[in-house]
């Protein structure tokens, strides 16, 4: 096992209540099997409640408190990375999804991003632009992480790639609003 990612909703149920103890348990596992960088091998995917769910003051308070705790832990390198899934943002991007299709769509989207990066990092090529060590370095950099995939329509222009990348970072399905100037790592595969 190279990495453990704990997935939890932060609205105040069992996910929010168990996420930090599960992070600690996963770190103990890596220490037990002899890994010295346990905190760098455990990450968290935290999903924010929708606006409708946050109509409950209890849910809104629980989510705020848990995300504050997770962000502090990620910033102090207690685990890496913290990936925040903004369910309300996804709901707005896919307004016609039924309740039954909503959660599988979110889950497939996030797991699909990991799948793409796993495939790209392990693809044989004469030109190695993103190898497993690069992927590992990005995953081990502390703090919050955003991921995205985009096509480049105007790849022959001087700014086509940078415009596509900028657009993707601004419209990622994951949570947004991060100051990218404070990023400690980045990876791009064209």
Give residue ranges: language-model regions.
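Tubulin/FtsZ superfamily GTPase core signature
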Residues: 1-190
């Amino acid at each position: 096992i190279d990495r453990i990612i704990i997935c939890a909703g932060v609205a105040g149920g069992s996910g929010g209540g168990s996420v930090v103890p599960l992070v600690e348990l996963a770190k103990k596992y890596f220490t037990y099997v002899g890994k010295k960088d346990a905190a760098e091998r455990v990450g968290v995917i935290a999903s924010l409640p929708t606006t409708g769910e946050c109509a409950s003051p209890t849910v809104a308070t629980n989510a705020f408190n848990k995300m504050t705790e997770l962000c502090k832990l990620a910033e102090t390198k207690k685990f890496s990375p913290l990936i925040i899934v903004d369910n309300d943002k996804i709901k707005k991007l896919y307004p016609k999804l039924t309740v039954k299709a909503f959660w599988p769509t979110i889950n497939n989207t996030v797991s699909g991003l990991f799948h793409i990066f796993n495939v790209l990092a392990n693809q044989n090529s004469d030109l190695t632009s993103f190898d497993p060590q690069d992927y590992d370095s990005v995953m081990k950099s502390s703090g919050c992480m955003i991921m995205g995939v985009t096509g480049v329509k105007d790849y022959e222009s001087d700014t086509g790639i940078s415009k596509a990348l900028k657009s993707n970072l601004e419209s990622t399905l994951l949570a947004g609003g991060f100051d990218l100037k404070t990023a400690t790592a980045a990876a791009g595969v064209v």
